[in-house]
Amino acid sequence: MPVTLGYWDIRGLAHAIRLLLEYTDTSYEEKKYTMGDAPNFDRSQWLNEKFKLGLDFPNLPYLIDGSHKITQSNAILRYIARKHDLCGETEEERIQLDILENQAMDTRMQLAMVCYSPDFEKRKPEYLEGLPEKMKLYSEFLGKRSWFAGDKITYVDFLIYDVLDQHRIFAPKCLDAFPNLKDFLARFEGLKKISDYMKSSRFSCKQIFAKMAVWNSK
C-alpha cells in the first residue's frame, strides 16, 4: 500500500522528501493542497482536513504510512531514511548528520525570511553579501568527498541538495567559486532514480514558496 505525502502544491519543505521517496523507490501518492490567491490566501482545502487525519501535531507536510502518521519535514526524512539505512553508519557520521540537518534548515529559513519579507528588495543585497561565507562553510565541510557524510549518500544530502539548488535559483552565480558544491549538485542529479524522476511528468520544482512570498511564489 503506498504511503501518502500531504503538502501544498509547491516545492517548499516537501522537495527533499519527494526526492528521497523516489530514490528509495517507495510507492507513494501525493495529497496536494492549493492555496487561494491574494489578498486572503484561502487555506480552506487544508484547514478543512487538518484535524481529521489523526495527526498528533497537525501540519504540512505530513506522511501517512499505515499506522504511522508523521509531521515535521525532517522527522519524515529521518523515518524514510531509517527504513533504507541512510542515517549514517558510525556515531561520528550520525553526529555530523545531526549538525548538517540543522545547519541546512537554518540556511533554508534564512532565505525564506528574505523571500517572504515585504522589504525583500532592501534585504536581498544584504543577504547576497553574506552568501559566499555561507556557501564556503558547506564547501569546506564537503571537501573532496562525494557526499556530505563520506562515501555513502545519506538523507542529509537530499536536504542540502534542495537548499543549495534553491540558492542557485535565487543567485545563479553563488556557487561559481565552489566547484565541489557544483559537482555535488551534478552528482546528485546524475543518480539514476533522481534523473528519471526529474525527467518525468511527476516532477515540479518551479514554485518554491507559497503565494504570499515576494520572490518565487508563482
UniProtKB/Swiss-Prot annotation:
Q: Which residues form the GST N-terminal domain?
A: 2-88
Is Transcription regulation one of the keywords? no
Tell me which residues bind glutathione. Y7, W8, W46, L47, N48, E49, K50, N59, L60, Q72, S73
What is one GO biological process annotated to this record? glutathione metabolic process
Give the primary localization class: cytoplasm
Which compartment or compartments is the protein found in?
A: Cytoplasm
Give the function comment from the record.
Conjugation of reduced glutathione to a wide number of exogenous and endogenous hydrophobic electrophiles.
| Protein name according to UniProt | Glutathione S-transferase
What is the protein's species of origin?
Mesocricetus auratus
> What does the organism's lineage look like at the top?
Eukaryota, Metazoa, Chordata, Craniata, Vertebrata
